[in-house]
Every structure is written in structure tokens, then in C-alpha cells.
UniProtKB/Swiss-Prot annotation:
Span of zinc fingers (CR-type): 134-216
Domain comment, as recorded: The J domain is necessary and sufficient to stimulate DnaK ATPase activity. Zinc center 1 plays an important role in the autonomous, DnaK-independent chaperone activity of DnaJ. Zinc center 2 is essential for interaction with DnaK and for DnaJ activity.
BP GO terms, sorted: chaperone cofactor-dependent protein refolding; DNA replication; protein refolding; response to heat
Top-level taxon of origin: Bacteria
Designated gene of the protein: dnaJ
Keyword Chaperone: yes
SUBUNIT field: Homodimer.
Family, per entry: Belongs to the DnaJ family.
Protein name (record): Chaperone protein DnaJ
Amino acid sequence: MAKRDYYEVLGVSKDASKDEIKKAYRKLSKKYHPDINQEEGAEEKFKEISEAYEVLSDENKRANYDQFGHDGPQGGFGGQGFGGGQDFGGFGGGFEDIFSSFFGGGAQRDPNVPRKGDDLQYTMTVTFEEAAFGTEKEISIRKQVKCETCDGSGAKPGSKKKTCHYCNGSGHVSVEQNTILGRVRTEKVCPVCNGTGEEIEEPCPTCHGKGTETKNVKIKVKVPEGVDNDQQIRLAGEGAPGHNGGPQGDLYVVFRVEPSDTFEREGDDIFYNLNVSFPQAALGDEIKVPTLKGHVMLSVPEGTQNGKQFRMKEKGIKNVHGYGYGDLFININVVTPTKLNDKQKSIMREFAEVSGEEITEQPTNFKERARRFFKGE
């Protein structure tokens, strides 16, 4: 019986993308998997689907199939000789794949070797104060954990596993390839048992044979003192479960720090904008200013100019790596009064006169401004 067209087997067009081919394979393999579908012919159908996907998911194999079909290239170089425009890549992967098959370079990683689980990432938002002083918070993340019912085996408790029918327990299957040197036989991991050599007879009712289940897990996280935006910590063993008895992956917690209503932060230094009145700036004053650990008095000397910056050493944030503390910088903003009463205006005029300044006061009402405008004053 002639083999069916691989594109027809997967139900895709000849110009289907890799994603479309993968999607079709997943859908069909799930439908006809021998562990799920016990109907007659399902096993053969599954083999046919697996074979079609193996070819169409590989660019070189697919190109070879598109050009030569199931039989592969016939008669070596045929009548084309070396000038027929035939690329070696059309023969199933070229010389590299061929010789790697002969000399062992094409051997695949043993799927039964214990492997560490995947690492996970969680973004945690903390307040400015929590980042400055450190704290402990509890988070809840949804992740894969070992199934408690089957203890990760994937099998129903009390049931047994059976020898894989597809590879007869070897964990590998032989696949023949057409190459420029003829047909080459290679060993590949069994697609049914994934190299274990065993099949689950009765899947676990909780995880349905996967060995893992998705749960909300609560984890306590210590927020380091002095942590800043985009910095992260690693929680060893809090990631996804390992494979074949391997260790769990890690959880990386990335921090997002909310801005403060009082301070601005640059690294370990913090900045505070202090508004002072004209008399305070001119005469000097003792002014109470906030710090991370309460208020302190700042001596503002007489004649302080707008934009002046004062520095309080080690009043900033503790370095997250333990390299001391940052500083607190206080920026002075001299506030000019917008509304003066008559007495205040009189004092200011007197001050200007004593200082030898000639002040041309600007009118505040519309009529006076209009009168001066038309008089050219």
C-alpha cells in the first residue's frame, strides 16, 4: 500500500508554516495517541502522523520530500552531473548530518538523565519604604508542582507501567534516511514513551499522566534592604519541578519600586526639595527637614540662593550589597510671595530704597495698566 502524502496526513497545505504544521501534529497526535484512543487503527494512524511530522518539521527533510517524494533521490546524481544545480542540502541535511550519523556526532541527549526544572520569574512591586528598609512579604504564584496523587510518576496509584509497544522497551526507534551515500539508519528517541521504554497503563486521575499539576503556591520573600528597580534575587528550588528525579528550577524575583511622595532616588542617594521663604533665605534659619529615619534640623545660612544644595552624609539608602549608605541631598527652592499686604509692600519698598534699588512697580488692576499703556509709561 502506497504511503499517503505527508501534507494530507497532517491536513495542511504544501506551503504551511512551521507553526501550522506543529499545531496540526499536536491536535492529531493527541486524538490518536494509543493511550487515549483504543479504537482499531488508531496506533497505525499515530505512527503515520509521527512520521509525517518528523519529516515536515525538519527544513532539510521537508525540502528533500518536496522534491523527491517518499522514495528520495534515485540514481545518485542522475543525468544532471555536478552542474545540474542540485544543492547537497536537498539530500536530508548535507554531509554534516551524514557523517555525524556514521561517527556518533548525531547522538541525541539521553532523555532519562535527571534534568533541572525550568526557572521561573515573578515581578514584585514594593513601596519606597519597603525597598529602603527591607521587609518580608508573601507572594502567591501559579506554577507546576509534582502531582501529590501519583508522586510525579503519572500513573494511577496501585497501577503498573507496561513496556512501550512502539519501541518494545528500548526507548529508541530506528529511522532510515535517504542520503547521497544511500540509505542511512539512525537511532532516535521514541516519540511515544519519550525514551523511558515504558508506557502508563492507567494514567493518574489528577494529573492525567503528566506527573505534574498546576497549583497556587505561597512563598515568603525577603526584600533586601536597599533594593532598587529591576534588581532581582534568586530563590533556589522554587521553580518548576525537575525531570527524571532532577532538582527543581529556581525562582527569580524582580523588584519594581514605587516612587516616594517625599523623596527622589538616584542609586543609594535620595533628594528632597525644600521650599524656603525670602526672609528665611535672606536672614538664615533653622528648618526641620525629613529623613528616612525621622526629622532633623537643617541650618540654612543667611544669603542662601535659590538652587543651593545641602548634603547630609549617610542619610540616604543602605547599599543593597552592604557598601555603606548613600547621602541625602536637600535642594533649596526660594519661594517668592505672590500676594503682599500693604504693610509688607511698604517694608519691601523701604528695603529696596535702603539697598539703592529703583523699583518700578507694576499695576495690579486693569484700569491702571491701560492708563500707563496709553501714556507710554
